[in-house]
Amino acid sequence: MIVFPAIDLKAGQVVRLAEGDMDRATVYGDNPAHQASLFAQAGSQYLHVVDLDGSFAGRAENREAVEGILKSFPGHVQLGGGIRTREAVSGWFDLGVSRVVMGTAALKDPQFVKDMAKEFPGGIVVAVDARDGMVATEGWADVSDVSVVDLARRFEDAGVASLLFTDIGRDGLLKGVNLDATVELARRVDIPVIASGGVKGIDDIRMLKIHEGDGIEGVITGRALYDGRLDLKAAIEMAEA
C-alpha cells in the first residue's frame, strides 16, 4: 500500500482546506519545493499535489510551484487540479508528472478521460469526490445527482490507473478516514482505490492496510502530517509491511 503525502497549493503556498472550503485554508508554508524534499527525506517515493486554484479556474494556476516540486522530489508525483484538456494532460507528463488526476472532467466528459487513459496508459487517476455518497465537482462547489459507485463503474474498462476517493465531509478535519465507504467502493469496483480525507493518525493507515486485499492501493494524508499527528516514516513502514 502506498502513502501519498499531500501538498495542496493556493497562491503558491502550501495549505490545507477544511472540507474543500477555500475560505478555510490553513497555510503551512510558502516553499512547496522544500516541503516536497522533506517528504522525500522521510522516505516517501510518492507525492500527491493539488493545484487548488486550478480546480476552480479549470486551468493551471500554480505551475511555477508544481515545477519546483518536480525538480526537488525524485519520486513519483501525482497531480490534480483543473486538468481538463489534452494539452494540459500531455504538458504535465512532459514535465515529469507520473499520474494526472481528473475529477470534474470525469463527470462532465467521461469519454475524454477514457481517451486520455488510452493515450497515457497507467497515467490517469479518476477522482471520485463525494458528499454524502454523491459526486461533487468544480472544486467541490457543485454536488451532482450521480452516486460514487455509478461514476466509478463508468471507468471500469477504460484503463484508468486508480480511483481517488475523497469524503469531502472529512477532508482536512482529522475525523478519521471513512473506512466503510472506501472499502465498499473498492469491493464493488474493479479498479484500485486510493483513500483520501480525514486521516488523523497511524490507526487509519493500519485499518486501510488490513483491507489492502479488497483493492485499497493507497492513502493520501495531509493535515495529520503537518500537525505532527502522523509520522510519515512510520506510516510508510506500516503501509509497505
Swiss-Prot record:
GO molecular function: 1-(5-phosphoribosyl)-5-[(5-phosphoribosylamino)methylideneamino]imidazole-4-carboxamide isomerase activity
Isomerase keyword on record: yes
Gene Ontology terms: cellular component: cytoplasm
UniProt keyword terms in alphabetical order: Amino-acid biosynthesis, Cytoplasm, Histidine biosynthesis, Isomerase
Transmembrane segments: none
Involved pathway(s): Amino-acid biosynthesis; L-histidine biosynthesis; L-histidine from 5-phospho-alpha-D-ribose 1-diphosphate: step 4/9
A Pfam cross-reference name: His_biosynth
Catalytic activity from the UniProt record: 1-(5-phospho-beta-D-ribosyl)-5-[(5-phospho-beta-D-ribosylamino)methylideneamino]imidazole-4-carboxamide = 5-[(5-phospho-1-deoxy-D-ribulos-1-ylimino)methylamino]-1-(5-phospho-beta-D-ribosyl)imidazole-4-carboxamide
EC number(s) from the headed UniProt entry: 5.3.1.16
Keyword Nucleus: no
InterPro entries found in the cross-reference section: Aldolase_TIM, His_biosynth, HisA_bact_arch, Isoase_HisA-like, Isoase_HisA-like_bact, RibuloseP-bd_barrel
Record-annotated active site: 8 (proton acceptor), 129 (proton donor)
A biological-process GO annotation: L-tryptophan biosynthetic process
Subcellular location(s) per record: Cytoplasm
PANTHER family in the cross-refs: 1-(5-PHOSPHORIBOSYL)-5-[(5-PHOSPHORIBOSYLAMINO)METHYLIDENEAMINO] IMIDAZOLE-4-CARBOXAMIDE ISOMERASE
The family this protein is said to belong to: Belongs to the HisA/HisF family.
HAMAP family given in the database record: HisA
Protein name: 1-(5-phosphoribosyl)-5-[(5-phosphoribosylamino)methylideneamino] imidazole-4-carboxamide isomerase
